[in-house]
């Protein structure tokens, strides 16, 4: 901010009492300068006799700092702006007028913490996941997030593994959600039915809404060899489903059952009618083709493609991560936290026209444009 410092020096040395406003944009998307909302904000500031420099005005958040009662400091993704003298007039107006119609909110996403007290196996560092999760939670708590979701396989095995990592996850300062993974049910048969409640879940599958966006959390263990005791009817039904549908996918995957599929369709119909945008979460991927995919991935995809409100499907399970786009829907597999000594998680910011994935550790940064 050399220009800012120069103007401050001129003002201080001359004693001139002149209104001014200087901003420096360190980030902007090519083409932003033509955005009508930005142009409107700039024009309105000029009408007030305030010069605004820098295109990235749509993500400002105000924070009064007051140097001798006169200063105000604004900061946002890529913009630092300082105003003197006009602070009282400019600051509340600017925060109100430049509130982004593009940037909506952000959320944290984690996949496959997969903690247990066992020794490492290959690249999987099971016991280290507690430390990684703690580091992740500390970082996420330093951001203004609407919620955080863990995308399944919170533990690797053993019911008492929850005792170690749940308190860490529950120390998040924002709502914290779970999707169920196959390893979450790698516990003694007597504990399997208690897993969702132990994880603090409102149901095995559910939905919630944030600022015009509908989030649908699916249970890919609905039809499963992992989620039910071996002597249960559900386990037997999984065997029938697997044989009758001639599934070649590994048995550690699962399927979204018929009742849940009908529920999902109803939620999507409601979201479409209300003009909401939708992101789905599940432990298991559905696209691109992969051995980790849901048994009924094709069925799920065909339903999602019926609805223009569906923008993304985000999952875990495949620790290497993966990405694909099909018919305007983004399919994002996040990398598993349990893998290697390095961490992996992300903060995803929701904008009107894109999703921005900020990867931490091994996770990849991405821009997912919305149609």
Locate predicted features.
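Catalytic His-Asp segment of secreted/periplasmic serine-dependent ester chemistry enzymes
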Residues: 26-97, 333
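Solvent-exposed loop/turn segments at secondary-structure junctions
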Residues: 26-30, 58-61, 113-116, 154-157, ...
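Loop/turn elements at helix/coil->beta-strand transitions in domains of secreted/extracellular proteins
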Residues: 15-20, 47-52, 103-106, 143-147, ...
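Active-site segments of SGNH/GDSL-like serine hydrolases
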Residues: 9-36, 180, 279-288
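Extended active-site neighborhood of metal-dependent phosphoesterases/phosphodiesterases
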Residues: 160-274, 299-309, 323-359, 369
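Stable alpha-helical elements in mature extracytoplasmic
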Residues: 2-6, 34, 38-41, 78, ...
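N-terminal active-site segment of His-dependent metallophosphoesterases
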Residues: 98-163
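Active-site neighborhood of phospho(di)ester-bond hydrolases with catalytic His/Asp-centered motifs
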Residues: 109-111, 148-153, 176-182, 218, ...
């Amino acid at each position: 901010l050399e220009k800012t410092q120069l103007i401050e020096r001129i003002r201080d040395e001359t004693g001139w009492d002149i209104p001014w406003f200087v901003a420096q944009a360190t980030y902007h998307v090519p083409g932003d300068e033509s955005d009508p909302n930005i142009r409107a904000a700039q024009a309105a500031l000029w009408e007030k006799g305030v010069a605004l420099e820098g295109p990235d005005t749509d993500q400002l958040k105000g924070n009064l700092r007051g140097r001798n009662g006169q200063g105000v400091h604004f900061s946002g993704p890529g913009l630092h702006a300082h105003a003197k003298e006009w602070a009282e007039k400019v600051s509340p107006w600017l925060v109100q007028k430049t509130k982004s119609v593009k940037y909506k909110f952000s959320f944290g996403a984690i996949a496959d913490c997969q903690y247990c007290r066992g020794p490492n196996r290959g690249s999987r560092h099971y016991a280290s996941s507690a430390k990684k999760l703690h580091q992740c939670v500390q970082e996420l708590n330093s951001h203004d997030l609407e919620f955080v979701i863990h995308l399944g396989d919170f533990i690797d095995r053993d019911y008492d593994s929850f005792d170690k990592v749940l308190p860490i996850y529950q120390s998040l300062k924002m709502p914290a959600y779970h999707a169920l993974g196959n390893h979450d049910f790698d516990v003694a048969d007597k504990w399997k039915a208690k897993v969702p409640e132990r994880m603090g879940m409102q149901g095995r599958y559910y939905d919630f809404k944030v600022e015009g966006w509908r989030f649908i959390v699916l249970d890919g263990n609905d039809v499963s060899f992992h989620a039910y005791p071996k002597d249960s009817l559900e386990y037997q039904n999984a065997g029938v489903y697997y044989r009758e549908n001639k599934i070649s996918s590994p048995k550690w995957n699962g399927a979204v059952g018929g009742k849940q599929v009908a529920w999902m369709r109803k939620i999507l119909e409601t979201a479409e009618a209300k003009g909401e945008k939708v992101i789905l979460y599940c432990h298991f991927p559905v696209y691109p083709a992969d051995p980790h995919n849901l048994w009924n991935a094709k069925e799920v995809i065909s339903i999602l493609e019926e609805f223009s409100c569906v923008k993304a499907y985000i999952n875990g399970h495949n620790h290497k991560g993966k990405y694909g786009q099909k018919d305007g829907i983004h399919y994002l597999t996040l990398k598993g936290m349990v893998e290697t000594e390095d961490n992996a998680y992300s903060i995803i910011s929701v904008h009107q026209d894109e999703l921005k994935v900020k990867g931490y550790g091994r996770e990849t940064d991405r821009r997912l444009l919305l149609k």
